[in-house]
Amino acid sequence: MKKIAVTSERSYEVEIGRSYLEALIEIAQGRERVAVIYSEAMKEQIPTFDFGGAEAFYFGIADGEAGKSARTLESIWNWLGAAGFTRSDLIIGIGGGAVTDLAGYAAASWLRGLDWVAVPTTVAGMVDAAIGGKTGVNSEYGKNLIGAFHSPSQVIIDLKWLETLSDRDYAAGLAEVVKTGFISDVTILDLLDGKNIKSIRKN
């Protein structure tokens, strides 16, 4: 897998390729417990992990912003407590931006900070939501009002997840690609200019 270093107060690597299972198993080595938080809409696509001695716990949440709530977060806290999660254990978030935001904030707030890994499965998640360490949940007064900066230990981008997206969802994520291009590198826009969604996905 290709690796890109992200330098910050809590530096980490973004791995890009097609073998996220191997990468997760490697980072879970030496842990006693691993929590896998995922979208219920993806339940059939989430494998039963063999973390080589670490006990795996699975927590499915409602799809999209509906699952990114303080109530869901409280359920995760209770679940982590019942399972005996300690500072040396690991949280993994597999899904779109709502899932990685929630998993990251659960990690930030439990015992003042657990390691966590983001496995984004959408274009927007791969380009924006899982990168940078912004984590949080929504409240009844607005989106992302409760949160913290807590960078992941690792971001694992498996390009195979893109094959599961509809053209509509794929195209929606390209808006984040365009935004990133304007902010960071306008040459990115050349990859999209004059192309339809079919040709972009093919390449």
Model-assigned labels for residue ranges:
Residues 45-48, 102-104, 128:
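Short glycine-/acidic-enriched loop or helix-start segments at secondary-structure transitions
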Residues 1-90, 179:
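ATP/NTP phosphate-donor binding region
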Residues 105-198:
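A glycine/threonine-rich phosphate-anchoring loop and its flanking beta-alpha core
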Residues 89-111:
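Glycine/serine-rich anion-binding loops at beta->alpha junctions
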Residues 52-54, 58-68, 186-203:
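Active-site-proximal helix-loop elements at catalytic-domain edges
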Residues 19, 71, 169-172, 187, ...:
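Conserved active-site and cofactor/substrate-binding residues in soluble primary-metabolism enzymes
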